[in-house]
Amino acid sequence: MRATAHYPRTADQLSAARAFVRDTLASWGCRERIDDAVLLVSELFTNAILHGAGRVDLRMELVDARLTVEVVDAGRGPPVSLGPDPGIEATTGRGLLIVDKLAERWGDGHDQHGRTHMWVEVANP
């Protein structure tokens, strides 16, 4: 199963992206992973808002009980990596640490048009 949505790259679209994930997974019968998937999309979508360019595409695919979620934007930033823990007082900088803990696998890359792709993969129990 596949689903795709497109959003302007603005903070007010984050709630629509979360609702899309929630509704899509519920319709696919994947209720056990909705909370994790919504949090993962929140982190990736927020990174696209802060560091990307152009519209944001949200793609979801469920194959053999494995959910892949991808957030794509027109930003041409360098590949991302985990940085050090920002510390207890920091108000930012934890997004990829959260992604790393919740996702079984995750990564990023650029397509032939230079668009940035961030993806996560989780199993649906």
Question: How does the language model describe each region?
Answer:
Residues A5-Y7, G29-R31, S81:
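A short, structure-level motif marking secondary-structure boundaries and short turns
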Residues S15-S42, A90:
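Conserved short strand/loop->alpha-helix "switch" segment adjacent to the catalytic nucleotide/phosphoryl-transfer site
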